[in-house]
Amino acid sequence: MAIIIGLEFAQLPMSFGAKYE
């Protein structure tokens, strides 16, 4: 999970950041 979140978070910090947090 950490790997996927890291890759996605690097590209879309706003979108995924808000979703996961």
From Swiss-Prot:
Gene: yadW
Conditions for induction: Expressed in both exponential and stationary phase; expression is considerably higher in exponential phase (at protein level).
Protein name: Protein YadW
